Swiss-Prot record:
GO MF entry, a single one: ATP binding
Key words, A-Z: ATP-binding, GTP-binding, Nucleotide-binding
Function: Displays ATPase and GTPase activities.
Phylogenetic placement of the source organism: Bacteria, Pseudomonadati, Pseudomonadota, Gammaproteobacteria, Pseudomonadales
Residues annotated to bind GTP: 60-63
UniProt organism field: Pseudomonas putida (strain ATCC 47054 / DSM 6125 / CFBP 8728 / NCIMB 11950 / KT2440)
Family statement: Belongs to the RapZ-like family.
Binding residues annotated for ATP, in chain numbering: 8-15
InterPro entries registered for this protein in UniProt: P-loop_NTPase, RapZ-like, RapZ-like_N, RapZ_C
Name the record gives this protein: Nucleotide-binding protein PP_0949
Keyword RNA-binding carried by entry: no
Length: 284
């Protein structure tokens, strides 16, 4: 049996995550009391005909604070039943969460007469801290629309053809912010920028004219070789430490040229030596 626990601050996309999982064949339970996690795992093993082999539950700040504080031991009890448990934690910048609530006019579950929306979001962050600390996978939804979030969940959580650590090599642009869910970040803004070549500006790092330009730059080759050597040496150590997910982020200014080119090359090389390597371009 596989159990996916979905959590995160309100407005970060938990409902969307559950919808994706349900569409993928998971039996989904919204707002499960955290204290029932061990019982859910136990009942799933005893009554296999009652539950599907894939179950997803959401746990949020509407739980009793005492149950949320006990989440580490509750998760350990569930895993002691020899069930594969993955914790997915969704989050976004506070300003983005405020904007989402303003646009939808929904009420935050922790607001009241004495607590503003901004205060409720900060309180929620504290309450969910024990879950966030144990997340196997964190997804920052700040810059993701509904469709991008759905694709990200499918790519990172469901598209694992073989067991073991899932590696994601992701390009991004610093002008839209660093991905907060990245484990390793490499800044390639010091490399020659095709943006300043008028004939290359409208192309991306996936297009042959940009590829040819960057491949001819000695600094680009040196940077690629240094990053590649580091990753080839150390990523197997991450896998050996039983990490479920590792995200490698490559950033340039806009996320269209240099980071895309480097990310594509790294992805192809890592796929030759590691299992479960995926490539994503956040800002294309």
């Amino acid at each position: 049996m596989r159990l996916i626990i979905v959590s995160g601050r309100s407005g970060s996309g938990k409902s969307t995550a559950l919808d994706v999982l349900e569409d993928s064949g998971f039996y989904c339970i919204d707002n499960l009391p955290a204290g029932l996690l061990p019982q859910l795992a136990e009942n799933a093993l005893i009554n296999t005909e009652l539950l599907q082999p894939k179950v997803a539950v959401s746990i949020d700040a509407r739980n009793l604070p005492s149950h949320l504080m006990r989440f580490p031991e509750l998760l350990e009890e569930a895993r002691a039943r020899h069930i594969q448990c993955d914790v997915l934690y969704l989050d976004a910048d506070e300003e983005v969460l405020l904007k989402r609530f303003s646009e939808t006019r929904r009420r935050h579950p922790l607001t009241n007469a004495n607590r503003s929306l901004a205060e409720a979001i900060r309180v929620e962050s504290d309450l969910l801290g024990p879950i966030a600390d144990l997340a196997d996978l964190k997804i920052d939804t700040t810059n993701l629309n509904l469709y991008q979030l759905r694709d990200s969940i499918k790519l990172r959580l469901l598209n694992q053809p073989e067991p073991g650590t899932a590696f994601l090599v992701e390009s991004f642009g610093f002008k839209r912010g660093m991905p907060v869910d990245a484990d390793l970040v490499f800044d390639v803004r010091c490399l020659p920028n095709p943006y300043w070549k008028p004939e290359l500006r409208e192309h991306s790092g996936l297009d042959q004219p940009v590829i040819d330009y960057l491949a001819a730059q000695p600094d680009v080759e040196d940077m690629y070789n240094d990053i590649s050597s580091y990753l080839l040496k150390w990523l197997p150590r991450f896998a050996a430490s039983n990490r479920a997910y590792v995200t490698i982020a490559i950033g340039c200014t806009g996320g269209h040229h240099r980071s895309v080119y480097i990310t594509e090359r790294l992805g192809r090389q890592l796929q030759q030596t590691l299992k479960n390597v995926q490539v994503r371009h956040r800002d294309l």
